[in-house]
Amino acid sequence: NLLMAISNKTGKLVLTTGNKSEMAVGYATLYGDMAGGFAVIKDVPKTLVYDLARYRNEQSRVIPERVITRAPSAELAPDQEDTDSLPPYEILDPILEDFIERDLSPAEISAKGFDPEVVARVTRMVVRNEYKRRQAPPGVRISRRAFGRDRRYPITSGFN
């Protein structure tokens, strides 16, 4: 990995790019975008990442507008968008917050008005991707329940 070679040569850390929403549902690639020494935004939901980017640009434009306005994509296939297999982040993030931060069950989350099938799929994704989160580098904690520290789930137990 070129970035890791540069890191070793210069004594600097490689920063990863995964946010809490992506880490929650497994939209992070082991030894790809998860490879690094520090995960700056691993506890920041995707919607807040966009809010922070817009706020930063209000001070002075340093983030290209196309980065903020283009549809989110894992970029693993041509014309792929995250919403091909996920709900929009404006829906996903509140579901994740209820499940991860508030320990609400899928039934309790659905009772708040979310589609029960979407909630079930999202919560399954969270549980199934614990193994990836265990391999993530450390990062800043901004929430009540950060992955790897405050919320750990058994990997091999088969709990639902």
Language-model-detected regions and their locations in the chain:
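ATP/NTP-dependent adenylation/nucleotidyl-transfer catalytic domains that generate, transfer
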Residues: 1-160
